Amino acid sequence: MRVNGKKVSAAPVAGKYLCINREWANGDCVELTLPMSLSMRTWQVNKNSVSVDYGPLTLSLKIAEKYVEKDSRETAIGDSKWQKGADSKKWPTTEIYPDSPWNYSLVLDKKEPLKNFKVIRKSWPADNYPFTVASVPLEVKAIGRPVPEWKIDETGLCGVLPEEDAVKGDKEEITLIPMGAARLRISAFPNTKE
């Protein structure tokens, strides 16, 4: 780590905050170099689903997004109420739906689970905003298999993860992106060991 170009002695610990006690000034620049390698976590309490990380970034499936604008008075639920005279047209509801398949398992090599994953770096976006599916400058290509029984539930949300032995379709290349760029997020995947 460097502050204003000078190395700072610090002992960062994974999963912990790093505190720098100093008097800060306008224009101070902090540079932090993080290890950037692929890793995987298994969620035993969530049907042995897996998540993939690239350094400090957790990855999500890249899902095309369909935006539907609605009148906020129609979509208000529970105790959501509008004040009399408020113009709801100035505060529309935007619902986001998947516009591409999202129900994939990850195909993982038994000996080297991340062997078939490929990191692709793209140009930084001209608007300096990397937090959208279209502008994210990092993608990871992987192999997935669709899981047809994993569907949107009756509330319009992603259904419960299927069992590991759920029927899966043919292998396909899929793209993962940093979670912060995805509005619709599948970040815990059923796995398919091959």
Name what the model sees in each region.
Residues Y17-C19:
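Short, surface-exposed beta-strand/beta-hairpin micro-motifs centered on an aromatic residue
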Residues R2-V3, S9-V13, R22-A25, C29-E194:
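C-terminal beta-rich recognition modules with glycine/proline-rich loops and embedded aromatic residues
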